[in-house]
Regions:
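Terminal transmembrane helical module of multi-pass membrane proteins
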Residues: 146-235
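Membrane-proximal helix-loop-helix units in multi-pass membrane proteins
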Residues: 102-163
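Physicochemical signature of membrane-embedded alpha-helices that form the seven-helix bundle of GPCRs
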Residues: 52, 135-142, 184-187
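Selected alpha-helical membrane-embedding segments in polytopic membrane proteins
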Residues: 36-117
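N-terminal juxtamembrane cytosolic/stromal segments of multi-pass membrane proteins
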Residues: 1-46, 229-234
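Membrane-embedded alpha-helical transmembrane segments of multi-pass integral membrane proteins
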Residues: 56-60, 85-88, 143-146, 169, ...
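Hydrophobic alpha-helical transmembrane segments and adjacent interfacial helices
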Residues: 58-66, 114-126, 146-148, 166-178
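Membrane-helix interface and helix-disruption motif detector
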Residues: 65-79, 124-135, 175-184
C-alpha cells in the first residue's frame, strides 16, 4: 500500500529517512548551553540554498529600506551578491537536481534571479523611473514564477502556496507605501526560512541512472520508511 502525495501535509516536521541525494552535504546542528539543548536540526543542501537566499533577500531589501546608501552603490553590491548566490545555488543543488531530473528548474531560477538583477540595474543606471518605482512587485513576481516552476517540477502544493503568497504580495505591496522594501524582504525571507525549516510535500521518488544499484536500494528502503510513517500518521 502506498500513500498518495495529496495525503501528505503541505508542511510538517522533517522526516529523518532521507534519500542519498538529500544526505549529500547534510549539515546537522546541535547547540547546547551546558547540558541544555538550545536548538537541534538538520539541513540538506536544498535547505541550505533556502537559508542562503533568505539571508540575501533580507540583506538587500532591509538595506534599501533603512540605510542611506546610494542606489548605484547598492546596485553594485547586490548584483555581486546575487551572482555569488546563484553560483552557490547551482553548486549546492546540482547533484540533487540531477538525480531528481529537474536540472531545468535550476536554470529557471538562475535566469529569473539574473534577469531581475539586469532589470534592476538598468532601472537604476539608466533612470527607468517606472521600473524603479515597481522593484518590489517585480521581485515578488519573479519569485512567484520561480515557485510556480518548482510546482511543475516537483508537484508540490507547498510551493504553490508560496507562489500564491508572493502573487498576493505583488498585488497589495503598493498599499504599503514607504514600507514596500521592508515588507517585500520580510515576505521573501520568511517564506524561504519556512521551506528550509520544515518538510514540504513533493511527487513520489523517481528512478535515476545516476545512482548505483546499492544507492537505489537504499532510497527504496528510505521511501518505505517514510510511507510507513505516513500510514501511521493517517491512522492516528
Amino acid at each position: 500500500m502506498t500513500v498518495s502525495p495529496f495525503s501528505q501535509p503541505l508542511l510538517r516536521d522533517k522526516q529523518e529517512a532521507l534519500d542519498i541525494q538529500d544526505l549529500q552535504g547534510l549539515v546537522c546542528l546541535n547547540l547546547k548551553v551546558g547540558s541544555i539543548r538550545v536548538f537541534s536540526g538538520f539541513y540538506t543542501r536544498i535547505d541550505q540554498v533556502f537559508i542562503l537566499w533568505g539571508l540575501i533577500c533580507a540583506g538587500i531589501f532591509l538595506t534599501a529600506q533603512f540605510l542611506a546608501i546610494s542606489w548605484d552603490t547598492q546596485a553594485i553590491w547586490w548584483s555581486t551578491l546575487t551572482l555569488v548566490g546563484s553560483i552557490a545555488m547551482v553548486v549546492l543543488t546540482w547533484f540533487w537536481a540531477s538525480v531528481e531530473k529537474v536540472r531545468w528548474l535550476v536554470y529557471c531560477w538562475v535566469i529569473l534571479m539574473l534577469g531581475g538583477v539586469v532589470l534592476t540595474d538598468l532601472s537604476i543606471f539608466l533612470g527607468w523611473g517606472e521600473v524603479l518605482m515597481r522593484l518590489c512587485p517585480l521581485w515578488l513576481g519573479l519569485t512567484s514564477i520561480g515557485y510556480l516552476c518548482t510546482v511543475l517540477a516537483l508537484r508540490s502544493r507547498a510551493f504553490l502556496l508560496m507562489a500564491l503568497i508572493h502573487l498576493l504580495g505583488m498585488a497589495i505591496i503598493p498599499y504599503f507605501s514607504e514600507w514596500q522594501f521592508f515588507t517585500t524582504g520580510l515576505v521573501m525571507m520568511i517564506s524561504l526560512l519556512i521551506m528550509a525549516e520544515l518538510q514540504w510535500d513533493m511527487r513520489p521518488p523517481i528512478d535515476s541512472d545516476l545512482l548505483t544499484p546499492e544507492q537505489k536500494l537504499f532510497n527504496q528502503h528510505q521511501n518505505q520508511r517514510r510511507q510507513l510513517a505516513d500510514l501511521q500518521r493517517v491512522k492516528n
